[in-house]
């Protein structure tokens, strides 16, 4: 499972991205408001067949998957994260950003506390696509009680989780008094549950992080 339900405003007119097997694909951004009025601006990719329904400043609802791809930026390898659109729907009047995902912990989770005392755990989920041999490696972040419990998960653990795909702006220090504006894209988790072999939910190992949801939405 790898599904995102996203609705919001189209920031700009879609632009040609790539062509494969005779089919053209286009990319653009959707801005989606949280309840806190903060905005996540997410890159989306769609096939040409949807193009005539995508107009700048229109509100729209889409269903798709979170996709990732490595690319070279000079000598560095970076991760491209975007929403691959599979369905278009009429805007329902409220912005939405909800993700359901199952996958495997593929790195050692990193637990830390911010200067303001917030507990955070960063980790990466490998989600296998339905086509054989391809996976998407999705950065994820957990907060509070969820942060502590996810920090204890072992590499290879199969989990189901839900949350929001967020864009987070930050400043990276590149010199003594010099900073670079950057944007991180990550799955902000509000619930997760361990899965048994075959994808069956394990009732003994689940964490509902809804007690942290208000902080998650205002973060």
Segments predicted by a language model, with ranges:
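Flexible glycine-rich surface loops and low-complexity tracts that mediate binding to linear polymers
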Residues: 58-71, 157-170
């Amino acid at each position: 499972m790898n599904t995102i339900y996203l609705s919001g405003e189209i920031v700009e007119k879609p632009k040609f991205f790539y062509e494969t097997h005779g089919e053209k694909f286009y990319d653009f951004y959707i801005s989606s408001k949280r309840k806190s009025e903060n905005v996540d601006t997410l890159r989306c990719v769609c096939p040409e067949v949807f193009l005539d329904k995508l107009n700048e400043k229109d509100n729209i609802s889409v269903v798709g998957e979170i996709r990732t791809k490595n690319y070279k930026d000079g000598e560095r390898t970076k991760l491209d994260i975007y929403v691959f659109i599979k369905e278009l729907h009429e805007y329902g009047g409220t912005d939405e950003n909800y993700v359901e995902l199952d996958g495997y912990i593929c790195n050692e989770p990193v637990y830390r506390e911010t200067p303001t005392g917030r507990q955070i755990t960063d980790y990466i989920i490998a989600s296998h696509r339905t086509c054989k041999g391809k996976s998407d490696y999705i950065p994820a972040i957990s907060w509070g009680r969820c942060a502590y419990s996810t920090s204890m998960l072992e590499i290879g653990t199969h989990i189901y989780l839900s949350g929001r795909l967020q864009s987070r702006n930050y400043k990276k220090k590149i010199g003594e008094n010099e900073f670079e504006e950057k944007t991180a894209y990550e799955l902000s988790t509000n619930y997760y549950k361990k899965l048994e072999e075959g994808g069956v939910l394990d009732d003994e190992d689940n964490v509902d992080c809804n007690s942290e949801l208000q902080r998650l939405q205002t973060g």
